[in-house]
Amino acid sequence: LLAARMSGGIASARHGRRSAVGLAVADPGLGLSCGLDAGSHFVAASAIKVTILSALLLKTGGAGHLTAAQRSLARAMITQSSNAAADRLWAEVGIGGMQRFLNRAGMTQTRLNDAWGLTELTAANELTLLRLLTSPGPVLTPASRSYVLTLMAQVIAGQRWGTPAGIGAGVAVHVKNGWLPYPTGRDWRINSLGTFAGPGTAYQMAVLTSGNPSMNYGVNTIEAAARVVNRDIAEFVAWLRSGGTGTMPS
């Protein structure tokens, strides 16, 4: 019922928008899984930087094995979205290292490109990545998962738009976004990845877009959908915490 309500709200939020959208959201504890064109491919832009860091951690053996220089580059790449730092770490990991991580993570839909920002993602694969970062598993150590999420929690204020839109107080937010005017400057690729944890909930959301006439247009498209997701989950959790009495949110 929650997924059906959410799907309807997302469809309403998208009505009249020019953007193409791929969306995936899951809260395993609530049994929630919801998607919209989650298998469609979108140009990554800086959303790929979470995968670059994750692949680096797999290659080096974990967060405890990173050099001071690698840590400095990782912080700049995630918290400030430094392209120069991404260039350096992409070169260190290499296409082979990136593909090994994708294979281990089960991210079989992701299409690597020699230019990291032109790698093609799907919302379903990005949700797989976010689930990997927030759940125990064999791919990344607990310290590595915590390291990535800590950096995502420290993204600078001007880059914390997108999936956190409308999030309630007391919810921990980890976010990484991407934006690219490609190929003509009239088609912005705007993407947002987020994980959220609060009382009674821990969920992940990936929203990828293309066909945006401006950056703000794409951000607004993502945030309209994200507000639906964040509102619906908050209301459902509040209903559960009240004992599930009264009318279920609908």
Residue ranges of predicted features:
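Penicillin-recognizing serine hydrolase domain
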Residues: L1-V21, A26-L30, L89-S250
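Active-site SXXK
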Residues: G31, H41-H65, M77, M205
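A short glycine/serine-rich beta->alpha loop
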Residues: L36-F42, L112-W116
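Acidic/His-rich structured neighborhood in mature extracellular/periplasmic domains
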Residues: A45, A68, M107
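Short alpha-helical patches at coil-to-helix transitions and adjacent helical residues
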Residues: A47-V50, T79, N83, A123-L127
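Short, well-structured active-site flanking segments
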Residues: L58-A76, M98, S144
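Hydrophobic/aromatic-rich structural module bridging two neighboring secondary-structure elements via a short loop
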Residues: Q70-R75, S82-A91
